[in-house]
């Protein structure tokens, strides 16, 4: 008799994806982030579901309903902070996951990579709309500033913004629709993640060397399941340290003031995980130019396979490319810092230089360096 896990129609899918999946034997801990992202998504969906039971998406009661969750609902505070800080953990894992893909040349799996970029945009949209829901000062003004960027689109811009707002400013209609979208998006993300996995399993995983691992595969379970459990424990430990000891570390104090359309906060800024993109947006004095740079800063990932000029897939044996990769990482950290600073000297020029460096590194320096490395190896 065949094992039920190999014969049952549903179990068979699970078995081929998580148990008997042939996996390269040499994948490092950088390959843990996919499963960690899955955990973050499930955690956020579950906590979000319980928050939605007590939240009201009306401008008059939204802020007080969040206060009610924290003050009156049993364990409401921990659910709320696990949800908010869970989003931060999600983005840490996301950026590590994308960075891994760039370093080891995983973008040569075109379908997997492109679905991944779509996933990144979707998660960013969900996080942005979630930040609006508590209806604090930064929620309101963040929503106003970011949605207003669409007015830079020629001809249709103004109509588009008013259509998204559901009126002539960010108001009741905006909050209600943002709640609706914020509720549905994680399920769309989960569906996309399954497509992402489907495409990945068509080709099998990449590995640190970037060469075919068909000759050396091991079953996913128990080897990588136990490894993923270690990663998950570290993720949960970090999250709970944040939630229980510094729940507001990554938030903005302005969001503890109820939204007031008549009073603008001195420094409007998004959550920390959008600051690098916000810095790129602000570094261009023109509105449309800034919006284009903002979108391109993420959309540029789509071009990664086209910009790959090296004869080797991975950066493991390419020291010059490695240096540039870590310069890019430092550049993104610089811009994350700049995005949280006021628009004044010397932050303006640092932000502009960081933005130029970002595009220059990805579009010019890294492809040229790869060609130089090919020359060194006489390839």
UniProtKB/Swiss-Prot annotation:
<dbReference type="Pfam" id="PF00033">
    <property type="entry name" value="Cytochrome_B"/>
</dbReference>
<dbReference type="GO" id="GO:0046872">
    <property type="term" value="F:metal ion binding"/>
</dbReference>
<keyword id="KW-0472">Membrane</keyword>
<feature type="transmembrane region" description="Helical">
    <location>
        <begin position="77"/>
        <end position="98"/>
    </location>
</feature>
<feature type="transmembrane region" description="Helical">
    <location>
        <begin position="33"/>
        <end position="53"/>
    </location>
</feature>
<feature type="binding site" description="axial binding residue">
    <location>
        <position position="182"/>
    </location>
    <ligand>
        <name>heme b b562</name>
    </ligand>
</feature>
<dbReference type="InterPro" id="IPR030689">
    <property type="entry name" value="Cytochrome_b"/>
</dbReference>
<feature type="binding site" description="axial binding residue">
    <location>
        <position position="83"/>
    </location>
    <ligand>
        <name>heme b b562</name>
    </ligand>
</feature>
<keyword id="KW-1133">Transmembrane helix</keyword>
<comment type="subunit">
    <text>The cytochrome bc1 complex contains 11 subunits: 3 respiratory subunits (MT-CYB, CYC1 and UQCRFS1), 2 core proteins (UQCRC1 and UQCRC2) and 6 low-molecular weight proteins (UQCRH/QCR6, UQCRB/QCR7, UQCRQ/QCR8, UQCR10/QCR9, UQCR11/QCR10 and a cleavage product of UQCRFS1). This cytochrome bc1 complex then forms a dimer.</text>
</comment>
<protein>
    <recommendedName>
        <fullName>Cytochrome b</fullName>
    </recommendedName>
</protein>
<keyword id="KW-0999">Mitochondrion inner membrane</keyword>
<dbReference type="InterPro" id="IPR048259">
    <property type="entry name" value="Cytochrome_b_N_euk/bac"/>
</dbReference>
<keyword id="KW-0496">Mitochondrion</keyword>
<feature type="transmembrane region" description="Helical">
    <location>
        <begin position="347"/>
        <end position="367"/>
    </location>
</feature>
<feature type="transmembrane region" description="Helical">
    <location>
        <begin position="226"/>
        <end position="246"/>
    </location>
</feature>
<feature type="binding site" description="axial binding residue">
    <location>
        <position position="196"/>
    </location>
    <ligand>
        <name>heme b b566</name>
    </ligand>
</feature>
<dbReference type="GO" id="GO:0008121">
    <property type="term" value="F:ubiquinol-cytochrome-c reductase activity"/>
</dbReference>
<keyword id="KW-0830">Ubiquinone</keyword>
<keyword id="KW-0408">Iron</keyword>
<dbReference type="InterPro" id="IPR005798">
    <property type="entry name" value="Cyt_b/b6_C"/>
</dbReference>
<feature type="transmembrane region" description="Helical">
    <location>
        <begin position="288"/>
        <end position="308"/>
    </location>
</feature>
<dbReference type="InterPro" id="IPR016174">
    <property type="entry name" value="Di-haem_cyt_TM"/>
</dbReference>
<keyword id="KW-0479">Metal-binding</keyword>
<dbReference type="Pfam" id="PF00032">
    <property type="entry name" value="Cytochrom_B_C"/>
</dbReference>
<keyword id="KW-0349">Heme</keyword>
<comment type="function">
    <text>Component of the ubiquinol-cytochrome c reductase complex (complex III or cytochrome b-c1 complex) that is part of the mitochondrial respiratory chain. The b-c1 complex mediates electron transfer from ubiquinol to cytochrome c. Contributes to the generation of a proton gradient across the mitochondrial membrane that is then used for ATP synthesis.</text>
</comment>
<dbReference type="InterPro" id="IPR048260">
    <property type="entry name" value="Cytochrome_b_C_euk/bac"/>
</dbReference>
<dbReference type="InterPro" id="IPR005797">
    <property type="entry name" value="Cyt_b/b6_N"/>
</dbReference>
<keyword id="KW-0813">Transport</keyword>
<feature type="transmembrane region" description="Helical">
    <location>
        <begin position="320"/>
        <end position="340"/>
    </location>
</feature>
<keyword id="KW-0249">Electron transport</keyword>
<dbReference type="GO" id="GO:0006122">
    <property type="term" value="P:mitochondrial electron transport, ubiquinol to cytochrome c"/>
</dbReference>
<feature type="transmembrane region" description="Helical">
    <location>
        <begin position="113"/>
        <end position="133"/>
    </location>
</feature>
<dbReference type="InterPro" id="IPR036150">
    <property type="entry name" value="Cyt_b/b6_C_sf"/>
</dbReference>
<dbReference type="GO" id="GO:0045275">
    <property type="term" value="C:respiratory chain complex III"/>
</dbReference>
<keyword id="KW-0679">Respiratory chain</keyword>
<dbReference type="GO" id="GO:0005743">
    <property type="term" value="C:mitochondrial inner membrane"/>
</dbReference>
<feature type="transmembrane region" description="Helical">
    <location>
        <begin position="178"/>
        <end position="198"/>
    </location>
</feature>
<dbReference type="InterPro" id="IPR027387">
    <property type="entry name" value="Cytb/b6-like_sf"/>
</dbReference>
<feature type="binding site">
    <location>
        <position position="201"/>
    </location>
    <ligand>
        <name>a ubiquinone</name>
    </ligand>
</feature>
<keyword id="KW-0812">Transmembrane</keyword>
């Amino acid at each position: 008799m065949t094992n039920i896990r190999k014969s049952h129609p549903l179990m068979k899918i699970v078995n081929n994806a998580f148990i008997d999946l042939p996996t390269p034997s040499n994948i490092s801990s950088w390959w843990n982030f996919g499963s960690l992202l899955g955990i973050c998504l499930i955690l956020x969906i579950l906590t979000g579901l319980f928050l939605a039971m007590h939240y009201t998406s009306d401008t008059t009661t939204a802020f007080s309903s969040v206060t009610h969750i924290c003050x009156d609902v049993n364990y409401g505070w921990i659910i709320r902070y696990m949800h908010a800080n869970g989003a931060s953990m999600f983005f840490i894992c996301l950026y590590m996951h994308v960075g891994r893909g760039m370093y080891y040349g995983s973008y040569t799996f075109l379908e997997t990579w492109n679905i991944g970029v779509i996933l990144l945009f979707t998660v960013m949209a969900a996080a942005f709309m979630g930040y609006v829901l508590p209806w604090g000062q930064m929620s309101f003004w963040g929503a106003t500033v970011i949605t207003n960027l669409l007015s830079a689109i020629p001809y249709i811009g103004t109509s588009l913004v008013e259509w998204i707002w559901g009126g002539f400013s960010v108001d009741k209609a905006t909050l209600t629709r943002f709640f609706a979208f914020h509720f549905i998006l994680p399920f769309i993300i989960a569906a996309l993640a399954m497509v992402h996995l489907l495409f990945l399993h068509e080709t099998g995983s990449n590995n640190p060397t970037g060469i075919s691992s068909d000759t050396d595969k091991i079953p996913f379970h128990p080897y990588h399941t136990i490894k993923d459990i270690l990663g998950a424990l570290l993720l949960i430990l970090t999250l709970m340290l944040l939630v229980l000891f510094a729940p507001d570390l990554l938030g903005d104090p302005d969001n503890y003031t109820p939204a007031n359309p008549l009073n603008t906060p001195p420094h409007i800024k998004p959550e920390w995980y959008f600051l690098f993109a916000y810095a790129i947006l602000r570094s261009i004095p023109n509105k449309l130019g800034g919006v284009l740079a903002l979108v391109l800063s993420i959309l540029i990932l789509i071009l990664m396979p086209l910009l790959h000029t090296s004869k080797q897939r991975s950066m493991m044996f390419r020291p010059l490319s490695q240096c540039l990769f870590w310069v890019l990482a430092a550049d993104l950290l610089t811009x994350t810092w700049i995005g949280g600073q006021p628009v004044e000297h010397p932050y303006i020029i640092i932000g502009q230089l960081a933005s130029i460096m970002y595009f220059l590194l990805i579009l010019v320096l890294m492809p040229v360096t790869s060609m130089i490395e090919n020359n060194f190896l006489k390839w």
